[in-house]
Amino acid sequence: MQTDILASAPRTTDGQMLDQNGGTIARSRVKAVYIVPDTGAGSVVFRDGGASGAVKVTLNTLAGATASDYIEFPGEGLLFQTNVYADVTTVASVMIFYG
């Protein structure tokens, strides 16, 4: 099934991922993630349904603010039933591509 791919607004702190206009991203499939790391090693934990929601994936980053990471998920991507919450640690920014 073909779906349009959208890009979220970049997120620099813990919180719900938002679309480019600041709106909520509800049920969706995350197809890819773009992470700009900070100077130290860090991580991004994606949860379904807020700060205490189920962990869908944890992505660890290497130290180095000049080496961004682009990660594509196989198949149809990761399904988030409620919303997409990102818990960022030592990461400059994170952005998702979803549909």
Residue spans for each PLM region:
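Short, surface-exposed beta-strand/strand-loop-strand elements in extracellular ectodomains
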Residues: 40-57, 96-97
